[in-house]
């Protein structure tokens, strides 16, 4: 049957990528259909019950700045919040939250069901409708055909998924869900470059069988015994601590030599070591057997016992992801302190799945081979909820822009971690599941969690992603930061007015000349609050107080203080960005035949011809493309007179002629 309604965007898959893609396209006014094999699993946290972390939290904040759902859902479902690297500089500080699986999923479902322009339909997709080199819709397993102008594919681990526990394996998309075998076969028919990856999950434990008195308690920030007691972190720029449910601690135990011996005794039945698993696993989230094998000299590994929610006894033992046989899982769990009598509710497993080489994507995440078909999430070779959500939003907004007949949007590497993520995938590809870290961003000083809204919300508003309520909150914050920064720069402190004792109390030493407040705030040990107490609050402003700005007050003060203290470093990084921008703005000709550039090595020519980077900047970051190769390519392009590369026109005196 051909469904009578036609859509602008069809999103296949309802995980973290799919939900953000569908919400983004619908917010932009496109008629959007979200197809999922099971509506009950929309927004499901398939692995660990947590959101955020180093690099990952930055992505969540950026998704939020563009109007996305993940941060708000985490504020509604978060049962523990922590600021990681809180003692370090603001560029590497990151928010991490434990989430109640049920509350998180319910929050996502609520947003989906109440989003205008968005329709849900429960059916697995078996086929894509393709006419010529363009996708025109999707076909479900019972033969319902939906026509659309674009399709966003966010299939997660479902494409030809296979679960492994010991030497036993079976087809599945995740535990309890069927795989997408037909869709995987169809994509292979389209001759898209494909490979296999794997990921894993630990056995889940019954909290009633855990002896927590033998474990170390780990309270969250704002909890009794935690950092900043009474002050709970918030993930969304429009969230607040009142949204959070009851907070819970995590617990810590450790593996030991006996645990390691038990794990080694199962190596001969491990699918990873016996060659049953072909896919490559995530380097930064290895299975426990991989850790014991690779780090044989380590006597123990930390294991975090994370609560799955407020209404369940289930715990997630973070650190023992495994595909070992169940009898080994049973023994290794019970060998650890506090877990001697632990009951396993669900066995751990590894899952293998298809992914497609992201180097075959355009910078909009549209496939090069099939027009209108976009990929996002684990299908692109990434791992993690946060990476998936960011890609989903990105693919969804670009599908919507294509439907509008507008140019694709891509933030630069100096504008967003999202830009770093996309650029890394389409230029370097993946050899293992890709995870975001702050170290992947060369301009991370200006890509902080705290300023994600300042970097992206205006762009989101221009595209139609940001609603009025978010825009109003952002505008108030932006204007307050600007006003307060200007006030500090124009307010002067005279040593004749401030006594040496008062100056020493606030500034650490007396001042000998006049300073403005902004310059005084640049001093390492002078905080905003302390500075405003100078001369009994003479220099404080009522405009940034909580009774005027409400929840925005703290973030405004934070922005002003960071701008002052890191001004020199930020200015230096802006200069670096300017120098790097030259290559980013040079677009490579679409018609260029790289095989006809004789100065380049055959390997470089082959790589450029196959992956066809869009800019010289992208080409410079491709694997195997050296700075020397880029110089030779520029010489070729200038000699050929290609647009943007032609030599400058000069007059007889050697000066640039005016147009």
Curated annotation (Swiss-Prot):
Recorded family membership: Belongs to the MnmG family.
Cofactor entry: FAD
SMART domains, alphabetized: GIDA_assoc_3
Gene source species: Delftia acidovorans (strain DSM 14801 / SPH-1)
GO terms, biological process: tRNA methylation; tRNA wobble uridine modification
Pfam families: GIDA (PF01134), GIDA_C_1st (PF21680), SAM_GIDA_C (PF13932)
Molecular function in Gene Ontology: flavin adenine dinucleotide binding
Described function: NAD-binding protein involved in the addition of a carboxymethylaminomethyl (cmnm) group at the wobble position (U34) of certain tRNAs, forming tRNA-cmnm(5)s(2)U34.
PANTHER family given in the database record: GLUCOSE INHIBITED DIVISION PROTEIN A, PROTEIN MTO1 HOMOLOG, MITOCHONDRIAL
SUPFAM superfamilies: FAD/NAD(P)-binding domain
Self-association and partners: Homodimer. Heterotetramer of two MnmE and two MnmG subunits.
Protein name, as recorded: tRNA uridine 5-carboxymethylaminomethyl modification enzyme MnmG
Residues binding NAD(+): 281-295
Parts forming coiled coils: none
GO-annotated cellular components: cytosol
